[in-house]
Amino acid sequence: MTTETFVKDVKPGLKNLSVLFIVLETGRVTKTKDGHEVRTCKVADKTGSINISVWDDLGNFIQPGDIIRLTKGYASLFKGCLTLYTGRGGDLQKIGEFCMVYSEVPNFSEPNPEYIAQQSQNKQAQAESGTGTNSHNSSSPAPPASDLENGNGSNSSGPPTHQSTAPTHSTSGRITRSQPNHSIPGAPNSVSNGKEPRRTGKR
């Protein structure tokens, strides 16, 4: 038999939960595209309250004041809010009414900034791993990642990276023509790079 979990100990991703709670409120029924009925109920124990999402006929039988034991449940985030669900083979069993010590606060289903930040980081990590170039940059230290967020990595790094990025952004034909001119000692004025003549003109 699994040990009972208090509402305060429920965390996203936990599975096979056994929770004893009292029903405080039963929410409105919403229908999914598949035709299932979903009802969100506010439940509580002595450590706090949380929302539970109940599907189909089970939701019709739940009433405020019912004391219920959830077995084989799991916890997940829904729109940034911690929510309990009945898992596969999970069960809601009414074991009494009204007589239970509970606390409505803290409400663990209120939007939690930590969970929202964690979800956004996970989404960014998935987006970066989806493309080949971003996955290489995501493995480098934090400052290059922030440079990527700013747009160009060359803006924050100064002229050395600007010079190194200029050949990669220009066409390869121009690079091969300008490189031999750099190797000739007497030809600094004949450089074909568009940016360098402007610099020499400013001096």
From Swiss-Prot:
Any one GO CC term of this protein is: SOSS complex
Q: List the disulfide bonds.
A: none
Q: Where is this region: Disordered?
A: 111-203
UniProt biased composition (Low complexity) = 129-140
The cross-references to InterPro entries, in alphabetical order and at most eight, read: NA-bd_OB-fold (IPR012340), SOSS-B (IPR051231)
MF-aspect GO terms:
single-stranded DNA binding
Question: Main site of residence?
Answer: nucleus
Q: Answer yes or no on keyword Mitochondrion.
A: no
Q: Could you tell me where this protein is found in the cell?
A: Nucleus
* UniProt keyword annotation of Transmembrane helix present: no
Bias class Polar residues marks the residues at 117-128, 149-182
Give the UniProt record's GO annotations in the biological process aspect.
DNA damage response; DNA repair; double-strand break repair via homologous recombination; mitotic G2/M transition checkpoint; response to ionizing radiation
DNA-binding region location: 22-92
Q: Which UniProt keywords apply?
A: DNA damage, DNA repair, DNA-binding, Nucleus
Coiled-coil-forming residues are: none
Question: Belongs to which family?
Answer: Belongs to the SOSS-B family. SOSS-B1 subfamily.
Its subunit composition reads: Component of the SOSS complex, composed of soss-b (soss-b1/nabp2 or soss-b2/nabp1), soss-a/ints3 and soss-c/inip. SOSS complexes containing soss-b1/nabp2 are more abundant than complexes containing soss-b2/nabp1.
Functional summary from the UniProt entry: Component of the SOSS complex, a multiprotein complex that functions downstream of the MRN complex to promote DNA repair and G2/M checkpoint. In the SOSS complex, acts as a sensor of single-stranded DNA that binds to single-stranded DNA. The SOSS complex associates with DNA lesions and influences diverse endpoints in the cellular DNA damage response including cell-cycle checkpoint activation, recombinational repair and maintenance of genomic stability. Required for efficient homologous recombination-dependent repair of double-strand breaks (DSBs).
Task: List the protein's name.
Answer: SOSS complex subunit B1
Q: Which gene encodes it?
A: nabp2
